[in-house]
Amino acid sequence: ETTTALLANKVRTGLTVLGIVIGIGSVIAMVAIGTGAQQSVQESIQSIGSNLLMVRPGSQRGPGQPVSQGQGSAVTLTLEDSNAIKDTVSSIEAIAPVVSSNSQVIANGQNTRTSISGTTPDYVSVRNLGIDAGQFFTAEQDARLAKVAVLGPDVVDTLFGDGSSSGTSSVDPADVVGRKIRIGGIDFTVIGTTASKGGSGFGSEDDVIYVPLSTAMQYLSGSDALSLINITIANESE
């Protein structure tokens, strides 16, 4: 549906691309303000990937409303849309659809509420995500709806450390691998933890729990609607 809409509304698609180009120009102008601001912006962009494109579902905007982050007029995005984009855009290097939600998480006698991201193994490369201990889940685990989870460092500290959520865990991440947690009343096994990336204008990935996309759709979100599609574009020089 999304791909069809883009092809059927070439003018609107062109304006959307223009909006993204203008947005990039604004970032470039902002970077030029000063050395300090430049370094901060560059570090934020590099932490998530300098060739990253984020596609979000949205609603129809009126005249004068800006276009941002590839947000379009489709009310929902689905896995079929993600696959269609991957199959039709030749410059795509990797793609990682995401289903996001907030859920109650219980472990080790601790009870908290945090962000849950259901995604695919390519998320690691698409978002420059480092693995601190254990491993990220595999395509095979995603396909069989495995109840496995990868924890950000803030989550590790909240559930298994001193609860400070400081970005520097007070517990050895390796000791968390193999532990059980409950997400929305469902048992998951921790198979890995991510390296700290810190917070930025793009948000923090330290206070997130990652689970396989199919698992999230089946057990947590109850829907096949995607929250976001992360795409990395191949560099022209490659």
Regions found by a protein language model. Name each.
Residues 1-22:
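N-terminal Sec/SRP start-transfer signal
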Residues 22-25, 29, 33:
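Hydrophobic alpha-helical membrane-associated segments
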Residues 35-115, 119-125, 139-140, 217-218:
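Hydrophobic, regular-secondary-structure patches
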Residues 17-19, 32, 185:
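Residue-level recognition of transmembrane alpha-helices
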